[in-house]
């Protein structure tokens, strides 16, 4: 199938994308920054099922780290054919007056600049004009990009809105290079980030969950399955698309 790099692949949605990608035949680079133990467990699980995987520590906001990650993945697994920009952070909840600028800057760098740096490196290697064979990029956005999340995390929502615009623009820019770029916009997913949202803003979270038409929050596989479809040949005519995965809530 090829080689996929999954940023933030040590836990949650990222870890499940890694596992499902391996089952579909991909060789997987599990990126992490702090979750070394968890990343290694994902790799071990893949290898126990006769898959190919490595873990690579890299800060996606640092160009040199990203370049090194791509180099290591290429040397150990082969040419990169797919990238999933999953690494992200929810930040602290609260109205705009409560924001700490240093933390907000970190949020923007991780959620928006990080995917840009990783995508730039991927395009340099995938684009036909650079000797590549094309490839696929999927960005993990959020339903917050549509709602704005007023009073809770407008700064987080803004980073994801920016990621959506980046997705549609880059898709048009690199389509002739054989590269497809898409995104998914999950709503609430049963992950550590969801638990943190519930801890910080329990009433807001519960009210939003009550308005989900299908009557439940998502499991990680609900998201990873769509990501793998977007990476597959079945989605070969799909680019510049943003798929809502929110149980019918926050959709057009």
Q: Language-model segments: which ranges?
A:
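Short, small/polar-rich loop/turn modules that mediate ligand/substrate recognition or access, typified
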Residues: 78, 175, 180, 238-240
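Catalytic loop of short-chain dehydrogenase/reductase
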Residues: 90, 132, 138-162, 167-176, ...
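Substrate-binding pocket helix/loop in short-chain dehydrogenase/reductase
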Residues: 94-99, 103-108, 208
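A short, exposed helix-loop element centered on a Lys and neighboring polar residues
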Residues: 119-120, 168
């Amino acid at each position: 199938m090829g080689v996929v790099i999954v940023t933030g692949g040590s836990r949650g949605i990222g870890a499940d994308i890694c596992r499902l990608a391996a089952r579909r035949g991909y060789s997987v680079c599990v990126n992490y920054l702090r979750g070394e133990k968890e990343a290694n467990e994902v790799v071990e699980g893949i290898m126990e099922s006769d898959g190919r995987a490595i873990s690579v520590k890299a800060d996606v906001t640092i160009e040199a780290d990203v370049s090194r990650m791509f180099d290591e993945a290429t040397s150990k697994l082969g040419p990169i054919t797919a990238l999933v920009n999953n690494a992200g952070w929810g930040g602290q909840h609260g109205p705009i007056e409560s924001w700490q600028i240093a933390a907000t800057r970190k949020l923007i760098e991780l959620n928006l600049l990080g995917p840009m740096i990783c995508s730039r490196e991927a395009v340099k290697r995938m684009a036909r004009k650079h000797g590549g064979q094309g490839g696929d990029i999927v960005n993990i956005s959020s339903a917050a990009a549509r709602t704005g999340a007023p009073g809770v995390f407008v700064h987080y929502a803004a980073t994801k809105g920016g990621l959506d615009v980046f997705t549609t623009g880059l898709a048009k820019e690199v389509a002739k290079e054989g590269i497809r770029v898409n995104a998914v916009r999950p709503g609430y997913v049963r992950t550590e980030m969801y638990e943190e949202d519930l801890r910080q803003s329990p009433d807001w979270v519960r009210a939003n969950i009550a308005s989900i038409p299908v009557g439940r929050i998502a499991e990680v596989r609900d998201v990873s399955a769509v990501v793998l479809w977007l990476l597959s040949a079945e989605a070969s005519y799909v680019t510049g698309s943003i798929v809502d995965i929110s149980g019918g809530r926050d959709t057009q």
